[in-house]
């Protein structure tokens, strides 16, 4: 298959090597069949995550050299603040060490115990902070998002009827805020339409309910709007992003994705009282409001990276490279989540491993098998990631049981995608050999990061 050249030149390289299959089997066993616990030196192609694994540009590296490491009032913070205000349109920004820090602040600031947070599908760390602060997360994403085989645009949209029902049943005063993820990670990187954002904003405004976006992959979402939503084909990515955020009261952001850096994040809001409280709280958990746990050089790189992410040539290449991998797997009959999203290809582990029940952790088993057979590291996104109910202690049982092949930005070429696809296609041809797993160590919180498993 023909494919376009990358829209960049490579100035620095890192040597990688493939260890033998016997060695990979041994390494996987030592890691308790958890791909998070593998050593990076033993990975050939690392598709665990797109978080903090980006390649920075020459301009970002140059910006690192003008890092102002003052404890307070760093010039790099003011550059970041100016950039975010211009591109997102929010009045205030509080930097954090990464997106999780912003989630922590928002949850403490916006949630009262006993309230509900409505959102378009959960995310692991986001829901953890919401529940830790006394909220119950309610999934109001459209039903189609839970069906891996449906190829529909904007599967990340909120179901407005579900939102209206929740407001009626629980009362607007009992909804802390609406958490709108753009894009929806665990649905397969599915985008949200501008029309849906606008409609959610209108309904929320009627009831006085705040909306906070999980903006981590907002630029990817903007690309899908430009590509697929009528009326936006001639609108710039920058202008689409700005309109997206005009329908929100604030956002959490992990800079480790669409800001094209290795560390960093921020919390945005328009409300003055919340901003004052956030500045007090960030000192406790992150650092001064002008650095939030970050070095000045990292804030500078984040400001530059956010502008670079808005360049059409970059984001087109980014999304189409992911789509290329998805297309190649689909054409070979490998079951994936449809349509391919913006940051990853999600293998449908239920269809890939139909001989395994959900209690045998098919996605975890598949991720381990992919590494042992191909040297590619991926991530489980199914029942293990979903965790347990805080009320009953029983496993959450997501309808989607997937393995995420997450493409780092500006790191791999199309040739790497070919290698990944060929290896997984070969594995699929003897999928019945994949064995189920069970816990040998289960952490109480965010278990997927450090759990250990063995074959049943």
Curated annotation (Swiss-Prot):
Record's keyword terms, sorted: Cytoplasm, Lyase, Pyridoxal phosphate
CDD domains for this protein: Tnase_like
E.C. numbers: 4.1.99.2
Question: What's an example of a GO molecular-function annotation for this chain?
Answer: tyrosine phenol-lyase activity
The record ties this protein, via SUPFAM superfamilies, to:
PLP-dependent transferases
Instruction: Report the record's Gene Ontology biological process terms.
Output: tyrosine metabolic process
Protein induction: By L-tyrosine.
Name the consequence of residue 157 to N: In strain: MT-10509
Q: Which portions of this protein are annotated as coiled-coil regions?
A: none
PROSITE patterns, alphabetically? BETA_ELIM_LYASE (PS00853)
- Impact of mutating residue 212 to Y? In strain: MT-10509
This protein's GO CC annotations: cytoplasm
What reaction does this catalyse? L-tyrosine + H2O = phenol + pyruvate + NH4(+)
Query: Where is the protein found, in the record's own terms?
Result: Cytoplasm
Swiss-Prot/TrEMBL cofactor(s): pyridoxal 5'-phosphate
- UniProt KW Heme keyword: no
Q: Which family does it belong to?
A: Belongs to the beta-eliminating lyase family.
The cross-references to PANTHER family, in alphabetical order and at most eight, read: BETA-ELIMINATING LYASE-LIKE PROTEIN-RELATED, TRYPTOPHANASE
NCBIfam families per record: PRK13238.1, tyr_phenol_ly
Q: What is this protein called?
A: Tyrosine phenol-lyase
Q: Which organism is it from?
A: Enterobacter agglomerans (Erwinia herbicola)
């Amino acid at each position: 298959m023909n494919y376009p050249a990358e829209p960049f030149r490579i100035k620095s390289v890192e040597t990688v090597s493939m260890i033998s299959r016997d060695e990979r089997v041994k390494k996987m066993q030592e890691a308790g069949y958890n791909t998070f616990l593998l050593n990076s030196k033993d990975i050939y192609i690392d598709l665990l995550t797109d978080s903090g694994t980006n390649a920075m540009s020459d301009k970002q590296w140059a910006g690192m050299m003008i890092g102002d490491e003052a404890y307070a009032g760093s010039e790099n913070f003011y550059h970041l603040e100016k950039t975010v205000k211009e591109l997102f349109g929010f009045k205030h920004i509080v930097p954090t060490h990464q997106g999780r820090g912003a989630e922590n602040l928002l949850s403490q600031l916006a949630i009262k115990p006993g309230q509900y947070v409505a959102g378009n599908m959960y995310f692991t760390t986001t829901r953890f902070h919401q529940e830790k602060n006394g909220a119950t997360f309610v999934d109001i994403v459209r039903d189609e998002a839970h069906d891996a085989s449906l190829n529909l645009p904007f599967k990340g949209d909120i179901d407005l009827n579900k939102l209206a029902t929740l407001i009626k049943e629980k009362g607007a005063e009992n909804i802390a805020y609406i958490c709108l993820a753009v894009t929806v990670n665990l649905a397969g990187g599915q985008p949200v339409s501008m029309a849906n954002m606008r409609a959610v904003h209108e309904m929320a405004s009627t009831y006085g309910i705040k909306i906070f976006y999980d903006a981590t992959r907002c630029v990817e979402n903007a690309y899908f709007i430009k590509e697929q939503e009528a009326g936006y084909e001639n609108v710039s990515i920058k202008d689409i992003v700005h309109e997206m955020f005009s329908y929100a009261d604030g956002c959490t952001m992990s800079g480790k994705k669409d800001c094209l850096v290795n560390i960093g994040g921020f919390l945005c809001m328009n409300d003055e009282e919340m901003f004052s409280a956030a500045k007090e709280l960030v000192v406790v958990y992150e650092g001064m409001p002008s650095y939030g746990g970050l070095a000045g050089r990292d804030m500078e790189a984040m400001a530059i990276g956010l502008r670079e992410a808005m360049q059409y040539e970059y984001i087109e290449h980014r999304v189409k490279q992911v789509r290329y991998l998805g297309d190649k797997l689909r054409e070979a009959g490998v079951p994936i989540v449809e349509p391919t999203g913006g940051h990853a290809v999600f293998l449908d582990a239920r269809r890939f491993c139909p001989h395994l029940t959900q209690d045998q952790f098919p996605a975890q088993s598949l991720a381990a098998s992919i590494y042992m057979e191909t040297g590619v590291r991926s991530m489980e996104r199914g029942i293990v990631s979903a965790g347990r109910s805080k009320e009953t202690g029983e496993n959450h049982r997501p309808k989607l049981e997937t393995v995420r092949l997450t493409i780092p930005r500006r790191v791999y070429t199309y040739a790497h995608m070919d290698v990944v696809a060929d290896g997984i296609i070969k594995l699929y041809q003897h999928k019945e050999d994949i064995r189920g797993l069970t816990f040998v160590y289960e952490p109480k919180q965010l278990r997927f990061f450090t759990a250990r498993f063995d074959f049943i």
